[in-house]
């Protein structure tokens, strides 16, 4: 694996460039922070990345509004990879994890058609997102498309029954007159809430298990979001400074009309 020390990155101006790139998503920020270097046997992969940056930079002016829209969605994404790993390992996700997973899927649902417009207009290749609809159907079975996460009463017949009983007790508690009656109803409500928590945990376990087969695709989509984020940042940087796609050859390195972005910005 190729490594370049921080001091070397600073000396050649690479660190200044990296600090000029503003990744929007946690996935893009990680790619910038953990910059990878291509080895000779990864030349084809590098050529593909350079091609995509060239195409995206060439359309930076024309697609400026679309880039801005994509970046807004990327900024709204949270790093849900830990929760996806837990689902893949059949651990029970909690409410917060399911809320964040649902939010991620909704952002993915919004991002996908935007990306397809960019891909088709700029001619990008080698980047694809999976359809988030099957995963969203698990976390939003009633198709409400609300931003929050809530386990619906209809999740199981028992949950519906428990919540109906809880509502009835709460109404009785509201109308109760004596302290003894209120204490009795409060104790009853505590028992019902414990049953509700137990039943909800079963539902969360089932949701996590249903997401498990989809986890790898969703993890791949997080990686693609990071690639897209980094790609856009590099394309905008290239457009700003008039960068061109380098031609990789087996001969000596030849640079023509080079500029130093750090000196340009002084």
Specify the residue positions occupied by each region the protein language model found.
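Short, solvent-exposed coil/turn linker segments
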Residues: 91-92, 217-218, 260
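Long amphipathic alpha-helical segments
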Residues: 114-129, 202-209, 237-243
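Conserved NTPase motor "head" modules and their coupling/switch loops across ABC/AAA+ ATPases, GTPases
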Residues: 220-266
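A structural signal for well-ordered alpha-helices, especially hydrophobic packing surfaces
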Residues: 50, 54-57, 61, 81-84, ...
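Extended, charged alpha-helical coiled-coil/arm scaffolds that mediate oligomerization and mechanical coupling
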Residues: 131-223, 227
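Residue-identity detector for glutamine
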Residues: 15, 29, 42-44, 76, ...
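Conserved amphipathic alpha-helical "coupling/scaffold" segments
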Residues: 1-151, 155
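Hydrophobic transmembrane alpha-helix bundles
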Residues: 105-112, 130-138, 159-163, 238-253, ...
